[in-house]
Structure formats: structure tokens, C-alpha cells
Amino acid sequence: AEVFKSEEGSVDFYGQLRPA
């Protein structure tokens, strides 16, 4: 699954926001 990571946290392929 693709995951977007940033300083604020990350969002997985399903759109779930996860803490940094």
C-alpha cells in the first residue's frame, strides 16, 4: 500500500491519518 508521509503525520492508501 502506498503511504504519504509528512511532518504532520502520514496518510495510508485508505485515507487513514496516522501520527508522525
Curated annotation (Swiss-Prot):
Keyword Membrane: yes
Entry annotated with the keyword Ligase: no
Subcellular location, record wording: Cell outer membrane
Keywords: Cell outer membrane, Ion transport, Membrane, Porin, Transmembrane, Transmembrane beta strand, Transport
Biological processes, Gene Ontology terms: monoatomic ion transport
GO molecular function: porin activity
One GO CC annotation: cell outer membrane
Function: Forms pores that allow passive diffusion of small molecules across the outer membrane.
Complex and partners: Homotrimer.
Family per record: Belongs to the Gram-negative porin family.
Protein name, per record: Outer membrane protein 40Va
Organism, scientific name: Vibrio alginolyticus
